[in-house]
Amino acid sequence: MSSVVVVGTQWGDEGKGKITDFLSEHAEVVARYQGGNNAGHTIVFNGVKYKLHLIPSGIFYKEKICVIGNGMVVDPKALLVELKYLHDRGVSTDNLRISNRAHVILPYHLKQDELEEERKGDNKIGTTKKGIGPAYMDKAARIGIRMADLLDREAFKEKLERNLAEKNRLFEKMYDAEGFNVDEIFEEYYEYGQQIAQYVCDTSVVLNDALDEGRRVLFEGAQGVMLDIDQGTYPFVTSSNPVAGGVTIGSGVGPSKIKRVVGVCKAYTSRVGDGPFPTELHDEIGQQIREVGREYGTTTGRPRRVGWFDSVVVRHARRVSGLTDLSLNSIDVLTGIPTVKICVAYKYNGEVLDEVPANLNILAKCEPVYEELPGWTEDITGVKSLEELPENARHYVERVSQLTGIPLAMFSVGPDRSQTNIVRNVYGI
């Protein structure tokens, strides 16, 4: 039995898709366990760039099973768009499996997400407005509609009628907005369900059978630890658990079956949306990192906020996700910067903090304590081993591993999967 979890250690956009794609080569099953189409990942496969939001990165390998787990929330309309996107490019999706227990995002979730953000004004969370939060709210309130319901004409109609009676009252009374017609949503989305029915099954059985047979299973996290609803910078977080512990809940696989956890981070930090960001850069270096690193959201297109590498954040991720291995991406983006900095602690009211404070008012006032290292000017995009890196770049990578306390397993010097280099094999093969 060999299972590996890939999680983001920052605020998402760390390059998890590329690392998952890279690790997929030796995996036999690839599964997502939380989130929805609010997560965007860019994958370069055979020289072609693909942008996915729902479907696991392993979809490009026909012989590998790809799983959308029960912990995800699925917009059937968005899923069908993504399936067509792949089919139009000659990519088969016969290897896709969708949990019959995954919850469904419906039009009223999208509308509620948008209206609530507008209502909050300056206090908005900065959601992607994909209906993720409202769908998870309904799940917690036990009124959600699952894939199994979507495929059952009678059950879907009954639950939709009940939910819309409440949702339409909410739209009219709280937001002064029009509600939805039950029949229109029912006919449209029941048809969507029929189009994806071939993929729907009990994915917990699929995953556990694979593990019991000794097959290699890769679990692909979305977003990042700092966006985790429990361990992140709450309330500026997503509505699910990207931490490694989310695998057991979101896939139906027991914790004893998780063997390795790879934490993915960039050589700097980025963030989309609102919330505290201690190492954020507002100067020319920040702009340089944004442009060279192409720091614009895959899902939203919004410019990402960027800053220096924060070892306090990644140490937090190591602790709450039990990270066993580190994957450091985008080292090449820092090339040409004379002095590079790593945040080693925070300072608040004269006190040095080694951990991320839960109180966001405190976090917002924290000043980063930096360690400065000499930069490098050499082109490193063709480097194939740690030893080939220029001395200053190699020292930077080693220092990140030391400060975070996570052994380095791989590092990347560019966006293509061929620019990802293995230091040690996470599958133990």
Curated annotation (Swiss-Prot):
It catalyses: IMP + L-aspartate + GTP = N(6)-(1,2-dicarboxyethyl)-AMP + GDP + phosphate + 2 H(+). SUPFAM superfamilies: P-loop containing nucleoside triphosphate hydrolases. Its main location: cytoplasm. Substrate binds at T298, T299, T300, G301, R302, P303, R304. It is found in: Cytoplasm. Pathway: Purine metabolism; AMP biosynthesis via de novo pathway; AMP from IMP: step 1/2. The keyword Transcription does not apply. The active site is at D13, H41. Mg(2+) binds at D13, G40. IMP binds at D13, E14, G15, K16, N38, A39, G40, H41, T128, R142, Q223, T238, R302. This is Adenylosuccinate synthetase. Keywords: Cytoplasm, GTP-binding, Ligase, Magnesium, Metal-binding, Nucleotide-binding, Purine biosynthesis. GO terms for cellular component: cytoplasm. Its cofactor is Mg(2+). Transmembrane segments: none annotated. InterPro entries: Adenylosuccin_syn_GTP-bd, Adenylosuccin_syn_Lys_AS, Adenylosuccinate_synth_dom1, Adenylosuccinate_synth_dom2, Adenylosuccinate_synth_dom3, Adenylosuccinate_synthetase, P-loop_NTPase. Its EC number is 6.3.4.4. Homodimer. GTP binds at residues 12-18, 40-42, 304, 330-332, 412-414. One of its GO terms (molecular function) is adenylosuccinate synthase activity. It comes from Bacillus cytotoxicus (strain DSM 22905 / CIP 110041 / 391-98 / NVH 391-98).
